[in-house]
Amino acid sequence: MNQSYGRLVSRAAIAATAMASALLLIKIFAWWYTGSVSILAALVDSLVDIAASLTNLLVVRYSLQPADEEHTFGHGKAESLAALAQSMFISGSALFLFLTGIQHLVRPEPLQAAGVGVVVTLIALVSTLALVTFQRWVVRKTQSQAVRADMLHYQSDVMMNGAILVALGLSWYGWHRADALFALGIGIYILYSALRMGYEAVQSLLDRALPDEERQDIITIVTAWPGIRGAHDLRTRQSGPTRFIQIHLEMEDNLPLVQAHVIADQVEQAILRRFPGSDVIIHQDPSSVVPAAQQGFFER
């Protein structure tokens, strides 16, 4: 799984870096030629895109390193650390755009050669849509947190490029403050996206449980298995591509140890079929020794 995961995520990061680098050069020329603060916003965002995508590429390769003596659970948390760092950089760029927008709102300046800005923005819009489509496919295949964060950022770029088109069109017809107003809006949206990304990264670092639907899938597998009288203490978390799942199964007091082991092993394999590559730990308890306070999500 890790080889396929690493290959797909690396391709997504390389594609994002290449596209952002090409668009950066185009936007530098367009900003110099038009003086548009909205294009400046897009230019700064492309710089952030390059940094984020390069970081994702390096971090994914590091996070896929096998566990060692000092990191017995692997290196998957590196993805969350990278996402947290990216959110800080993106917040700084959003603040810069916001302040620049205020400056141009107070002292608006007419745009030069707005048509060039429209062409550049259209190129950026089409390119970003293609990248987001590819990233969405990779996320569906890998569930990578790094690519999902990158995809959300590029989705905001699609919205930003659409807003820039509107701003340039309005400025063309004399609404010179529209450019600054849209820059302010873009800055606010980027800040919101950065804070959301940072929140998700912190939750991952704090070992937030798997989503409700995934935990429910685990419960469904366990409750359907014959020979299990109950279950409790379901604990889950995720680190990079790996899910960690722990659960206690309650069985008949007189069940032979070998048979209890076979049942637990069958349940483990069923969970792994649903969540390939997971780290599953199952503890078997005699049902009579489980205190009522510990009885969990079902009892037969």
From Swiss-Prot:
InterPro entries: Cation_efflux, Cation_efflux_CTD, Cation_efflux_CTD_sf, Cation_efflux_FieF, Cation_efflux_TMD_sf, CDF_Transporter. The chain crosses the membrane at residues 24-44, 82-102, 114-134, 156-176, 178-198. Belongs to the cation diffusion facilitator (CDF) transporter (TC 2.A.4) family. FieF subfamily. Zn(2+) binds at D45, D49, H153, D157. Keywords: Cell inner membrane, Cell membrane, Ion transport, Iron, Iron transport, Membrane, Metal-binding, Transmembrane, Transmembrane helix, Transport, Zinc, Zinc transport. Homodimer. This is Cation-efflux pump FieF. It catalyses: Zn(2+)(in) + H(+)(out) = Zn(2+)(out) + H(+)(in); Cd(2+)(in) + H(+)(out) = Cd(2+)(out) + H(+)(in); Fe(2+)(in) + H(+)(out) = Fe(2+)(out) + H(+)(in). Gene3D superfamilies: Cation efflux protein transmembrane domain, Cation efflux protein, cytoplasmic domain. Its main location: membrane. GO terms for cellular component: plasma membrane. The gene is fieF. It comes from Klebsiella pneumoniae subsp. pneumoniae (strain ATCC 700721 / MGH 78578). It is a multi-pass membrane protein. Divalent metal cation transporter which exports Zn(2+), Cd(2+) and possibly Fe(2+). May be involved in zinc and iron detoxification by efflux. The keyword Aminoacyl-tRNA synthetase does not apply. It holds the Pfam family Cation_efflux. One of its GO terms (biological process) is intracellular zinc ion homeostasis. The keyword Transmembrane helix applies. It is found in: Cell inner membrane. GO terms for molecular function: cadmium ion transmembrane transporter activity; ferrous iron transmembrane transporter activity; metal ion binding; zinc efflux antiporter activity.
